[in-house]
Design a protein with these regions (language model features):
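N-terminal secretory/targeting leader peptides
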Residues: 1-24, 41-191
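Signature of the catalytic double-stranded beta-helix
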Residues: 26-39
Length: 191
C-alpha cells in the first residue's frame, strides 16, 4: 500500500485508477523478468493456471476526525478486518481488529477512530456518515486473481485455451472501463 493518501474528491486524480493498479499487478505477474517466473513457478506448484488479476476496490480510510496523511493516522485506533491487519501494523498504525459489518457502529461509538474498507463498502454502508474525513489510498484493495485448475487447463485444446484467455482479457477490459468511467464517478457524487 502506498503511503500517499488523497482527499476523497480527488479519487481519479493523478492517475489513481483501479485499472492502473491491475495493469501493474499483471505486469509483475506476467511480464517482469524477475517476478513473473517466480509467480509462475508458485502457481504450477499449487496446481493452478493463472490468467491474471481482476479489478479491486479502492482502499478508503474513514476517520472520525480530520486526517490528510498516513502520519495523521498514527496513534489512532485503526479498524481493519483481521486479514488486512498485518499490512497496517507494518505501517506503524494502532490496529484494532474490526469486521466490516461492525464498522458503522464501531466508528459511531468511538471504538475505532478510523476504519479502512473498499470504497463500495464505504458507499453502500454509508460509513461516510460517521466521518469528518475520508482518504483514498493510492492503491486498490480486494484485488483478486483469476485462475483455473492446471489439470483442467491442460485437458483443453489450444483453441479452447485461447477462448478462455480472450474471455478473461475482454472481461478485464470491460471491468476497467466500467470501474474507472462509471462506478468511480457515481461514488464521487454519492460520497
Amino acid at each position: 500500500i502506498a503511503s500517499q493518501v488523497m482527499p476523497l474528491w480527488q479519487i481519479g486524480a493523478n492517475g489513481h485508477t483501479a485499472s492502473k493498479g491491475v495493469d501493474i499487478l499483471n505486469y509483475i505477474a506476467n511480464e517482469d523478468e524477475k517476478t513473473s517466473p517466480l509467480l509462475q513457478e508458485e502457481a504450477t506448484a499449487a496446481g493452478v493456471h493463472p490468467f491474471g488479476y481482476n479489478i479491486g476496490d479502492y482502499n478508503v480510510v474513514v476517520c472520525r476526525s480530520e486526517a490528510s496523511t498516513m502520519e495523521d493516522l498514527k496513534g489512532r485506533a485503526f479498524g481493519i478486518p483481521a486479514q488486512g491487519a498485518a499490512v497496517y501494523e507494518a505501517m506503524g498504525l494502532n490496529v484494532v481488529t474490526c469486521e466490516t459489518a461492525d464498522a458503522y457502529e464501531s466508528l459511531s461509538r468511538g471504538v475505532v477512530d478510523c476504519f479502512a474498507a473498499g470504497i463500495s463498502s464505504v458507499s453502500s454502508m454509508k460509513l461516510y456518515e460517521t466521518a469528518k474525513s475520508c482518504l483514498v489510498l493510492s492503491a486498490t484493495g480486494g484485488t483478486g486473481i483469476c485462475m483455473m485448475n492446471e489439470a483442467s487447463w491442460e485437458k483443453l485444446s489450444e483453441e479452447q485455451q485461447k477462448i478462455f484467455t480472450e474471455a478473461y482479457n475482454e472481461t478485464i477490459s470491460w471491468m476497467k472501463d466500467r470501474y474507472d468511467n462509471e462506478l468511480l464517478p457515481a461514488y464521487e457524487k454519492e460520497i
